[in-house]
């Protein structure tokens, strides 16, 4: 059986995002991939101040019932609800938009204004350009998402 992971992730995201938003959470990402001997559907959600285990259980109950009705995935899988984590890698432009205002560390593919590593706050995200206010100098850099080799959240004060 041919499995189009991206298509499944897209459909799941379209279906669960309004429900998760209606519960007061933000949908960070959806991942569907083989792990061990089976498949895992990972719903990554967050809210201001962080998400609790009880929140994950509540999301799981609602999302599980919804996915059973929609029947997008025609075989058994493990449903996992999780938070993005404190230093989760930012792998999609949407991730930067999700974490506006937060401190990030970027490793660039090529230097921009003489820098290959940038630590700063996400100011804005528009048309694939991420505006980062440098932590040290306060200067705003306009960095194309395509120029980022690695990006991750940083913990303040470490």
UniProtKB/Swiss-Prot annotation:
Localization terms from the record: Cytoplasm
Keywords: Cytoplasm, Ribosome biogenesis
Signal sequence residues: none
Keyword Zinc among record annotations: no
GO cellular component, one term: cytosol
One GO process term, biological-process aspect: translation
UniProt keyword annotation of Cytoplasm present: yes
Gene3D superfamilies, sorted: Ribosome maturation factor RimP, C-terminal domain (2.30.30.180), RimP-like superfamily, N-terminal (3.30.300.70)
InterPro entries with a match to the protein in the record: Ribosome_maturation_RimP, RimP_C, RimP_C_sf, RimP_N, RimP_N_sf
Functional description taken from the UniProt entry: Required for maturation of 30S ribosomal subunits.
Family label: Belongs to the RimP family.
Record-given protein name: Ribosome maturation factor RimP
């Amino acid at each position: 059986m041919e499995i189009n992971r991206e298509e499944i992730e897209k459909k799941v995201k379209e279906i669960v995002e309004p429900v998760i938003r209606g519960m007061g959470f933000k949908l960070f990402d959806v991942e569907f991939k083989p792990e061990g001997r089976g498949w895992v559907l990972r719903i990554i959600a967050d809210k201001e101040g962080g998400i609790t285990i009880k929140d994950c259980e509540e999301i799981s109950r609602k999302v599980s019932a919804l996915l059973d009705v929609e029947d997008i995935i025609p075989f058994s899988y493990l449903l996992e609800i999780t938070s993005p984590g404190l230093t989760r890698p930012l792998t999609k432009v949407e991730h930067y938009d999700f974490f506006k205002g937060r401190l990030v560390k970027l490793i660039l593919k090529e230097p921009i204004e003489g820098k290959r590593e940038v630590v700063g706050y996400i100011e804005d995200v528009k048309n694939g350009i991420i505006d980062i206010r440098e932590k040290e100098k306060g200067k705003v850099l306009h960095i194309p998402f395509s120029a980022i080799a690695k990006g991750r959240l940083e913990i303040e004060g470490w």
